[in-house]
Amino acid sequence: MAKEKGLTPQSQDFSEWYLEVIQKAELADYGPVRGTIVVRPYGYAIWENIQQVLDRMFKETGHQNAYFPLFIPMSFLRKEAEHVEGFSPELAVVTHAGGEELEEPLAVRPTSETVIGYMWSKWIRSWRDLPQLLNQWGNVVRWEMRTRPFLRTSEFLWQEGHTAHATREEAEEEVRRMLSIYARLAREYAAIPVIEGLKTEKEKFAGAVYTTTIEALMKDGKALQAGTSHYLGENFARAFDIKFQDRDLQVKYVHTTSWGLSWRFIGAIIMTHGDDRGLVLPPRLAPIQVVIVPIYKDESRERVLEAAQGLRQALQAKGLRVHLDDRDQHTPGYKFHEWELKGVPFRVELGPKDLEQGQAVLASRLGGKETLPLAALPEALPGKLVAFHEELYRRALAFREAHTRKVDTYEAFKEAVQEGFALAFHCGDKACERLIQEETTATTRCVPFEAEPEEGFCVRCGRPSAYGKRVVFAKAY
């Protein structure tokens, strides 16, 4: 069936399926520069819905939007040694402008900790200036060697939050608060189950004291880091001399955080829920929640379209995102296929016989059709969209549970990471972690916050566990 509809089956080649569905569902296309993509209106509408949800949650927690320059002096990046070392291989650098060589090369923003740190050093003087709670919506450039649409691109859209606090306690509370917002976005809006946890020293953000993350499992058994929140301690404050006078007139360094989520979240939605017929979009983020496909011949066209338009208005009055596909140049069958490919949760089929009987056919993207009274649809569909979300989440959670294994031997570990998450003990040594990656291509995803305390011995080297609980390992995007 997938072949007939022009998609490679997931079981045959998941990577090829992913690339095909992005193009055929008109989410994105390849840009003229290697590693760049053009996000088409349907794909951008998903990003806008993600933005709206996050922006509301950020503002509810006291954050304000701001914008900082795209060009950053290279000297800024060099001020934080770990930071520049971590980003150097991915930097795009401007050396000439206006036909002349620049006095100082400028990095094209890979992330904004440095330029925001510089500005805070000018703005923050007293405890009264704290906390600083900022968010920036924008683009960043990281010159990735191996690119894949939405997951790794040379330029991508994201939000990056940056906050400064008087105490470590306040900053750490912020780190967890923002991670929980990302987890809410995943679970409550994208229907994606995620594991919240701590990154290992090897996997943490360059320049952070520690990094927290939400990790999701894709249908091919690979993990995807869907959002991160970092405690930066005084690292950037010391590098940029961001000091304040506290209530006792003591001069101290601020404690900073940063946190970000990019359009790779769209990739997570595609790979968590999609099937051989195309996308399956979670209703709360879908650009179109209900598509109405009128079915008519010339003599019934006007009557059917009038009823379809009335239904659209009634559904929109309930706050639903509705599209009426009244194109004459395509058959109903073509339209059914197109909207299945694009992952619209519900399709309403409305023909002259349906009108005579005062009913319509409702088809779910999760499978199954039912006939309902036309007048009942505006009341029924909001609840059906909730049930659709819950079923989508249930299926994704069941998949994750079926592809998560506790392992205690390296042989069992190697088998487990071929299929999904392996829960294993680890010694915490970076060299041991690197060897595991070289030998299996699996990496540590996180030390889960919710995992039960448990003692054991490293799955590879046999030394005692460093974390007092099992670590999540997987192959990853």
Curated annotation (Swiss-Prot):
Q: State the Gene Ontology BP annotations.
A: prolyl-tRNA aminoacylation
Instruction: List the subcellular locations.
Output: Cytoplasm
Q: Which GO terms describe its cellular component?
A: aminoacyl-tRNA synthetase multienzyme complex; cytoplasm
Gene3D superfamilies documented for this protein: Anticodon-binding domain, Bira Bifunctional Protein, Domain 2, C-terminal domain of ProRS
User: Could you tell me the superkingdom of the organism this chain comes from?
Assistant: Bacteria
CDD domains in the cross-refs:
ProRS_anticodon_zinc, ProRS_core_arch_euk
The UniProt entry, under PROSITE patterns, shows: AA_TRNA_LIGASE_II
**Keyword Membrane recorded:** no
Return the InterPro entries for the record: aa-tRNA-synt_IIb (IPR002314), aa-tRNA-synth_II (IPR006195), aa-tRNA-synth_II/BPL/LPL (IPR045864), Anticodon-bd (IPR004154), Anticodon-bd_dom_sf (IPR036621), Pro-tRNA-ligase_IIa (IPR002316), Pro-tRNA-ligase_IIa_arc-type (IPR004499), Pro-tRNA_ligase_II_C (IPR016061)
| Keywords, comma-separated and alphabetical | Aminoacyl-tRNA synthetase, ATP-binding, Cytoplasm, Ligase, Nucleotide-binding, Protein biosynthesis
Q: What is its EC number?
A: 6.1.1.15
User: What's its job?
Assistant: Catalyzes the attachment of proline to tRNA(Pro) in a two-step reaction: proline is first activated by ATP to form Pro-AMP and then transferred to the acceptor end of tRNA(Pro).
NCBIfam families noted in UniProt = proS_fam_I (TIGR00408)
Name the family: Belongs to the class-II aminoacyl-tRNA synthetase family. ProS type 3 subfamily.
- UniProt remark on domains: Consists of three domains: the N-terminal catalytic domain, the anticodon-binding domain and the C-terminal extension.
Quote the protein name from its UniProt record. Answer: Proline--tRNA ligase
Which species does this protein come from? Thermus thermophilus (strain ATCC BAA-163 / DSM 7039 / HB27)
